[in-house]
Every structure is written in structure tokens, then in C-alpha cells.
């Protein structure tokens, strides 16, 4: 998370910074490591506040996932729950139930990029 914070600090206005915290999925979710997943969530919760403190006026932070993965579920496949979408910064507000295309649209609008039809 420290490296991500450095990237956010040095990002040019109008740029996109992307991070994938794959360990939630690969190390804990699919391996059904409940205690490891809990520790990772507690770490992330503590660190994300620091990152949010680095946001500048006009920045947008979007947190989401490509799927849910309940580490208490039997087996190693993806589970049925929806993925959260959390937004902070410019343009943040109540989104309701949305899909991946809506997340892409939110980011595209923020960056001033037209969405294809």
C-alpha cells in the first residue's frame, strides 16, 4: 500500500493509477483461509485511511473487485456474493446497485474519456 501511496502522491492531474490486491483472492479467498482473509482486511482497513488522506481536490478513488469470494464457503471456486463498489473523492455519491460497465463509465467520465456505445 505504501507504493500505491507514492504513486498517488506523484500522479499527474488527469491520470489513472490502478492497483490490484490479488492476495485477497489468491492467498486467502480461494484457499479458504478465513483467519488470513480477516487479517488482510484489517490491514487494508487501516491502510486505506492513510491513502484517502493523500487524495487531492479532484481525485477519485474507486474500490471494487471482479467477484465475491467468501473464504468460509466449501470448495475453491468463486462464491455467489456481489462485489462492493466504494467511491470517495470528486463525483462520489450513492450509486445503488450497479454493474462493471457503470464502474467503467464512472471512471471514464472522471477522466473525460468517451464510453463506446
Identify the function of each model-found stretch.
Residues 1-117:
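Feature captures the catalytic ectodomains and active-site-proximal regions of enzymes
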Amino acid at each position: 500500500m505504501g507504493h500505491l501511496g507514492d504513486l498517488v502522491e506523484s500522479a499527474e492531474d488527469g491520470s489513472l493509477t490502478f492497483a490490484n490486491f490479488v492476495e485477497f483472492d489468491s492467498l486467502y479467498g480461494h484457499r479458504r483461509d478465513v483467519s488470513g482473509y480477516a487479517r488482510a482486511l484489517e490491514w487494508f482497513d487501516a491502510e486505506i485511511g492513510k491513502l484517502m488522506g493523500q487524495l487531492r481536490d479532484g481525485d477519485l478513488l474507486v474500490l471494487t473487485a471482479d467477484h465475491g469470494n467468501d473464504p468460509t464457503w466449501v470448495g475453491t471456486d468463486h462464491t455467489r456474493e456481489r462485489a462492493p463498489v466504494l467511491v470517495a473523492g470528486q463525483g462520489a455519491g450513492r450509486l445503488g446497485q450497479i454493474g462493471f460497465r457503470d464502474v467503467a463509465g464512472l471512471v471514464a467520465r472522471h477522466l473525460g474519456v468517451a464510453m463506446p456505445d
